[in-house]
């Protein structure tokens, strides 16, 4: 994913992709290449595969308002009905944004202020989970949870009372991309495989199976506008994209700082 690929590029662990030899690379839309510049600034090393946002999945039968602000995750009315991500950078998103800080900050003061906010929230949190958030929300185990958009869409297939929202203050938008490891034994085969994944019928099959947002315009052109309008998790409006930020790789020192603060939260 985005910032890890950025780390691999900085560490010289990936090969440039021979886009000129790829027949179907043109299926990837321009705006997804623009997103990719945040971690592959020269657009040399990656091929976008899926993308999405981080937001709040909520149960309309358990909540009496739409949680369109990150402040909802601090609402004492829903004590023990809130699920957070068991992931340092994801869980810091709401706290940093509510403090008017970037989700890519490396400032220790800003991060400690966000930690304090998360510590204040902790008594309200039912659990810190990852993939299980989708299942718990689908089974009415909590009123709301911090979740990836694709997981939210899957949960909604099993529970008609679930809705997804990207809070008005903004959030993280992420791009999962392919890259070719340096020193691989079959570079030409790797490029052909990436091209195969960009082919419209293959990309459609993968989209229908994974059901995360696709950057493949040939796939998007085959989806009814009504279907797009009915799933804001998979097909977010441009205004949602514009208020989101992509994670950057922050370096070893910042990574260690985030992890130390995360440990402080877990033992608080």
Where are these regions (language model features)?
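Extracytoplasmic ligand-binding site segments that recognize negatively charged/polar headgroups
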Residues: 1-141
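Alpha-helix capping/helix-boundary segments
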Residues: 4, 133, 151-152, 202
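A ligand-binding cleft/hinge motif common to bilobed small-molecule-binding domains
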Residues: 5-7, 144-161
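Periplasmic-binding protein-like
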Residues: 111-120, 126, 158-182, 228
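Conserved C-terminal helix/tail region of periplasmic/extracytoplasmic solute-binding proteins
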Residues: 238-268
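Short beta-strand->loop
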Residues: 15-26, 46-47, 160-172, 181-184
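A bilobed periplasmic-binding-protein/Venus flytrap-type ligand-binding module shared by bacterial periplasmic
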Residues: 55-62, 96-100, 174-186, 197, ...
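Mature extracytoplasmic/periplasmic domains
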Residues: 181-242
